[in-house]
């Protein structure tokens, strides 16, 4: 090889190495930016998760409080008001459920009726305000040969099992 050809090859090699250094530098910079954006996204998702868990806890406490109030009014004579509240509650639940399903199209399980999860009493224990409802809207107890005691009813009403699926329960 001649000195001139070697000089040309060295110059060509130097340019290639310089381009590689520039490309590697750009890649490292983009990688740093990508990692920073990914960390920000992860932090935002974590913060949103914490907020949603707090909201879920608050909603579960509110459901507990409302169920306690319903149990406290089982024997009272405020039938019109209770029926109105239950109807409003069912309407609001159906509206929220339909909005939720617009974002997540999944078939609801059969019998997804909030009245069943809010009030669980047998027809003999039914509040007078509910006795006028059509049979398909009567809250039903699970079939059993004996009536549950009030502790069993309260445990069901206040456990996650008595909550709608959207609040962490199976219903």
Curated annotation (Swiss-Prot):
Residues 10-73 form the bZIP domain. Its main location: nucleus. It comes from the Eukaryota. Residues 143-152 have a biased composition (Low complexity). Pfam families: bZIP_1. It is found in: Nucleus. Keywords: Activator, DNA-binding, Meiosis, Nucleus, Transcription, Transcription regulation. GO terms for cellular component: atf1-pcr1 complex; mitotic spindle; nucleus. Residues 125-171 are annotated as: Disordered. CDD domains: bZIP_ATF2 (cd14687). Disruption phenotype: Sensitive to cold and thermal stress, simultaneous disruption of dph3 suppresses the growth defect during thermal stress. Heterodimer of pcr1/mts2 and atf1/mts1. Involved in regulation of gene expression for sexual development. Binds and activates CRE sites (cAMP-response elements, also known as M26 meiotic recombination hotspots). This is Transcription factor pcr1. The gene is pcr1.
């Amino acid at each position: 090889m001649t000195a001139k050809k070697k000089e040309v090859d060295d110059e060509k090699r130097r340019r290639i190495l310089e381009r590689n250094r520039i490309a590697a530098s750009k890649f490292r910079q983009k990688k740093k930016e990508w990692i920073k954006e990914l960390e920000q996204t992860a932090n935002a998702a974590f913060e949103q998760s914490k907020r949603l868990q707090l909201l879920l806890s608050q909603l579960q406490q509110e459901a507990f409080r409302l169920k306690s109030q319903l149990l406290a009014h089982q024997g009272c004579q405020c039938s019109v008001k209770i029926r109105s509240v239950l109807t409003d509650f069912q309407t609001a639940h159906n509206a929220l459920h339909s909005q939720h399903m617009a974002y997540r199209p999944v078939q609801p399980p059969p019998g997804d009726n909030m009245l069943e999860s809010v009030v669980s009493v047998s027809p003999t224990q039914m509040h007078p305000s509910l006795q006028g409802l059509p049979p398909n809207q009567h809250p039903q107890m699970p079939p059993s040969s004996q009536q549950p005691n009030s502790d069993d009813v309260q445990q069901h009403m206040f456990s996650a099992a008595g909550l709608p699926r959207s609040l962490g329960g199976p219903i």
